[in-house]
Amino acid sequence: MIKDEFLIKSWYIPLDFFSADDEGRTELPTDQKKQKAREEGRVLKSTEINTAVSLLLLFALFFFMLSYFALDLIAVFKEQAIKLPEVMRMSVYTMGFAYIRSIMGYVVLFFFASLAVNFFVNIIQVGFFITFKSLEPRWDKISFNFSRWAKNSFFSAGAFFNLFKSLLKVVIICLIYYFIIENNIGKISKLSEYTLQSGISIVLVIAYKICFFSVMFLAIVGVFDYLFQRSQYIESLKMTKEEVKQERKEMEGDPLLRSRIKERMRVILSTNLRVAIPQADVVITNPEHFAVAIKWDSETMLAPKVLAKGQDEIALTIKKIARENNVPLMENKLLARALYANVKVNEEIPREYWEIVSKILVRVYSITKKFN
């Protein structure tokens, strides 16, 4: 009985071993969270896309350089064939150095080309940025947690996906090699019967097919890998509701302070409106959602001017102040909306609105005159 209890306790695995580390992180990451992760060196990146694009460009460069490379080797061979008596007295190292010297230029060029290709492919995928934060020691990560390590190493979706991806690449690329070689086995077995030029052409065509289909397959793998890495990246940056609230609070400031600033702005706006509205000749309304105060003075203005405008709550304030100061209210839904959208405060009204505004002003003046 004691032995059974000991075994149960020894092999007991808590259920939270299989639960998500980020339990409760249900909110999508904000732009600020993504920017912070980028500054730390955590970016969305697919190594498979890098590999596929780099191999495609490097294979293209290789096959382009191949003809020039072959011509240089043939030139060295011809030079040594012409000077055969001298060559016979040379050491093997001296003879080989002539070939190495002609090859090294292409090797160096290919090396720097591969560095440039990888550099630019990475820039295209993640953009250009330099950060050293990922190299800084994270002392909070030193504490070893076997359950977390085992889960991330053996039971995570990333581990299974990478294992499946690696096995799939090995199997498919081996099958590509097998089928291409099998389809050309007749030509390969008779290479000794062809001329040197024909034999090289056959080998190059076979190599080209293998490279092309392998790169195409890696490109397809890269697309799926990018989609998977994107989902994992978003998942790793997900936030709790509390983190989102805290971030919004940091960005927008303390709610109490924000409400005080808003109230202060409302007081300032109301003060400005109480100065501007009494000077207006008419307030054009929507009637509920928009209000635009207009003034016209033929001696100082070339066209009527917008003194104040507002929407919703501000529109109600404008109408209230207008009533208190006996400024006429005229309802014209289309005009009120158009002036609110297209004319700024203290700007003159555009020419296309002159006719309709003049009619409203004439009507206002006639009513005011009759009232007086």
UniProtKB/Swiss-Prot annotation:
Q: Which InterPro entries match?
A: FlhB, T3SS_substrate_exporter, T3SS_substrate_exporter_C
Pfam families under this entry?
Bac_export_2
Q: GO:BP terms for this protein?
A: bacterial-type flagellum assembly; protein secretion
Where does this protein reside within or beyond the cell?
A: Cell inner membrane
Mind telling me which GO cellular component terms the entry cites? Answer: plasma membrane
Organism of provenance: Borreliella burgdorferi (strain ATCC 35210 / DSM 4680 / CIP 102532 / B31) (Borrelia burgdorferi)
Q: What is this protein called?
A: Flagellar biosynthetic protein FlhB
Give the encoding gene's name.
flhB
Query: What kind of membrane protein is this, topologically?
Result: Multi-pass membrane protein
Major localization listed first in the record, in broad terms: membrane
What does the record give as the function of this protein? Required for formation of the rod structure in the basal body of the flagellar apparatus. Together with FliI and FliH, may constitute the export apparatus of flagellin.
Respond yes or no to whether keyword Cell membrane is given for this record. yes
Q: TM spans, by residue?
A: 57-77, 104-124, 161-181, 202-222
Keywords of this entry = Bacterial flagellum biogenesis, Bacterial flagellum protein export, Cell inner membrane, Cell membrane, Membrane, Protein transport, Transmembrane, Transmembrane helix, Transport
Family from the record: Belongs to the type III secretion exporter family.
The superkingdom listed in its UniProt entry is: Bacteria
